[in-house]
């Protein structure tokens, strides 16, 4: 069984299988699909402008709060939540290689829903500052294959990450839950610098 905090400390990322499951996973995934159907593409999303995406959806904010204890256990860090974002990807979407802004110091990318008859869409991650474990990829690049309920936890400001064009399926819901280290250089980004956001775990 993987030692999540140790692996995260040594590599800057770790895969957490089944961080969410059961009826809660079903509920959140169905919510994401329905919101995408009702709202349509978000043209203000500069990374993938023609795909449904949502900042701080209330359901995801509560999921953010719900998973905080698991995130702290997996990383070995005390964390503040910052913000949430999710997309419902479509065929041919591509996420270019990038690093994230300070509010994404510690991030979780969670697979919520896709057609189980379709192949898993990989996430690639690399960070030359960290030692690599060969089982997760060749050289300095890791390839994460996430089933529904699985998550990639990573240092978003340090690890470059990307997804190649989505050819494996037709629709996939993915949520990104972002945190900062309470004792780190970006602690002032708590709540994404929007005071008054609701997070019950630390209030």
What role is predicted for each listed range?
Residues 91-157, 170-173, 182-194:
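Catalytic core of non-heme Fe(II) oxygenases with the double-stranded beta-helix
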Residues 74, 93-97, 163-164:
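Short helix-to-loop capping/linker segments positioned immediately adjacent to catalytic or ligand/cofactor-binding
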Residues 76-85:
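A short coil-to-beta-strand element that immediately follows conserved catalytic motifs
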Residues 88:
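Conserved active-site beta-strand element of glycosyltransferases/polysaccharide synthases
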Residues 1-75:
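Non-heme Fe(II)/2-oxoglutarate
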Residues 191-203:
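Acidic/histidine-enriched, glycine/proline-rich intrinsically disordered or flexible terminal extensions
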Residues 178-180:
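An acidic, glycine-/histidine-flanked metal-binding catalytic module
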Residues 157-161, 166:
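Short, charged beta-turn/beta-strand-edge "cap" motif at the junction between a beta-strand
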